[in-house]
């Protein structure tokens, strides 16, 4: 499949997700032990080049702040850019976030409640 690369395979593995479905135009990821796909990467149906959305963000709820930190670390090691270091936001809340932009420019967030 032409859109497959190891970035999402490795980053989503931190969250307990793996590819569960793949065909000529898309790949779907689900949590281990659950056959329901929660995240798809697809080629545009209109045949135009892939672009990222301005003002869009994909967020993944994790179980622990350690998963958030590992997600951030692995993503940066695979070529993502930092959009926000792991930390509580706001600083006095129980919500722990980290933000990256994947190699294509999509803004991705991993977060956990502690």
Residue ranges and their predicted role:
Residues 53-57:
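Short, solvent-exposed beta-strand edge segments and adjacent coil->beta transition regions
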Residues 15-52, 108-112:
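Conserved short beta-strand elements that form part of the metal-binding/catalytic scaffold
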Residues 12:
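Acyl-CoA/ACP chain-elongation machinery
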Residues 43-45, 86-90, 114:
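Short, well-ordered turn and helix-capping elements at secondary-structure junctions
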Residues 60-104:
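Vicinal oxygen chelate
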Residues 16-23, 59-61, 71-72:
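A broad, low-specificity signal for short, low-complexity segments enriched in glycine/proline
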């Amino acid at each position: 499949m032409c859109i497959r690369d190891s970035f999402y395979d490795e980053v989503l593995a931190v969250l307990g997700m793996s590819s569960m479905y793949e065909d000529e135009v898309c790949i779907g990821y689900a949590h281990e032990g659950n056959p329901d796909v929660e995240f798809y990467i697809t080629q545009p149906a209109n045949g135009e080049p892939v672009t990222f959305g301005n003002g869009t963000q994909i967020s993944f709820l994790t179980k622990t702040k350690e998963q958030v930190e590992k997600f951030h670390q692995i993503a940066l090691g695979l070529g993502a850019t930092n959009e926000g270091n792991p930390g509580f936001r706001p600083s006095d809340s129980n919500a722990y976030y980290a933000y990256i932009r994947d190699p294509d420019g999509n803004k991705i967030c991993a977060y956990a409640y502690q």
